Structure formats: structure tokens, C-alpha cells
């Protein structure tokens, strides 16, 4: 099982009681077990306290310890690769940021100005001219309909 030197006092007592019961000690012959009341009693807070990490690792079997160490080494290798990736990714972002700067400056120049654009789209001029002509005609009709006084004052 486990080494008696590494066991705590509570563990060694429990093991001794189990061994006595298996060997047919006094309690087993009388039918009244001292282990039963001990199992019903709540454990002391010190026994319920979590073990420190070092003690926990020491309590594991060697095969599990080897796996844990191997996983730690693999995780370190993954961390190194990820750090290298992040470094190269930042360098690549910087490179393309420098390439995009002139284009972004032109976009800012075009969108940031309040003046009209010097470039025109095809067909845009025709639509603007038609809209202006329609507006002028409407204004003339409104003026003629409600005009009082003017060149045609005396209509006969």
C-alpha cells in the first residue's frame, strides 16, 4: 500500500484498524466495531483541508507524475510557438499598415472635405440638369398663377 513513514497519524490508525479487523482482532470477535463510530464522526478540519500542491504531486503514482511533467514540457513548447506567431503577426500587421497608409489618407481626404467632388459619375450630370429644369418650370408656373401686377397687368 503506502509507506507508513509518509502517512499521517490518522491514516496509520485507520490502516491499523482495518488490519485488526481482517485478522480477527478483539472487536471482530465481539461484533462491536470501533471503526463504525469513528466513520460516523465528522473529520477534523485539518484532515479535510486541501493538500498543498507539492504533497499532492508526491502522492501521485510515478506514471502519472511522468505524464504531468511531459504535458508541462509540451505546454512550454506550445507557448513558445504561440509567442513566435504573435511576434510575426504583429510584424505583418505593421508591414501592411504602412502599405495602407497612403490609401487611408486619400479616403480621409475625400470623405473629410465638405466641398463637392471633382469626379462625376456617368449619367449624373443629365439627372441634375433635368431636376434643375423641372424646378425652374415649377417656379415660373407658380409665379404666373399668383402674380399680381407685372407686364400683363391689364388682361383684356
Swiss-Prot record:
Residues 1-16 have a biased composition (Basic and acidic residues). Its main location: nucleus. One of its GO terms (cellular component) is nucleus. Gene3D superfamilies: 1.20.5.1500. Residues 34-49 have a biased composition (Low complexity). Residues 122-143 have a biased composition (Acidic residues). Residues 68-94 form a coiled coil. InterPro entries: NAP-like_sf, NAP_family. Pfam families: NAP. It is found in: Nucleus. One of its GO terms (biological process) is nucleosome assembly. SUPFAM superfamilies: NAP-like. Keywords: Coiled coil, Nucleus. Residues 1-58, 120-156 are annotated as: Disordered. Belongs to the nucleosome assembly protein (NAP) family. This is Nucleosome assembly protein 1-like 5.
Amino acid at each position: 500500500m503506502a509507506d507508513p513513514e509518509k502517512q499521517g497519524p490518522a491514516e496509520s490508525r485507520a490502516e491499523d484498524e482495518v488490519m485488526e479487523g481482517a485478522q480477527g482482532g478483539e472487536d471482530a470477535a465481539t461484533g462491536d466495531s470501533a471503526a463504525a463510530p469513528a466513520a460516523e464522526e465528522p473529520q477534523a478540519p485539518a484532515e479535510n483541508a486541501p493538500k498543498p500542491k507539492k504533497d499532492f504531486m508526491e502522492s501521485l503514482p510515478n506514471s502519472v507524475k511522468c505524464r504531468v511533467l511531459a504535458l508541462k514540457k509540451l505546454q512550454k513548447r506550445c507557448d513558445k510557438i504561440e509567442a513566435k506567431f504573435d511576434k510575426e503577426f504583429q510584424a505583418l500587421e505593421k508591414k501592411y499598415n504602412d502599405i495602407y497608409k497612403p490609401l487611408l489618407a486619400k479616403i480621409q481626404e475625400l470623405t473629410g472635405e465638405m466641398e463637392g467632388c471633382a469626379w462625376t459619375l456617368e449619367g449624373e450630370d443629365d439627372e441634375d440638369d433635368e431636376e434643375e429644369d423641372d424646378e425652374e418650370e415649377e417656379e415660373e408656373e407658380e409665379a404666373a398663377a399668383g402674380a399680381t401686377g407685372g407686364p400683363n397687368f391689364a388682361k383684356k
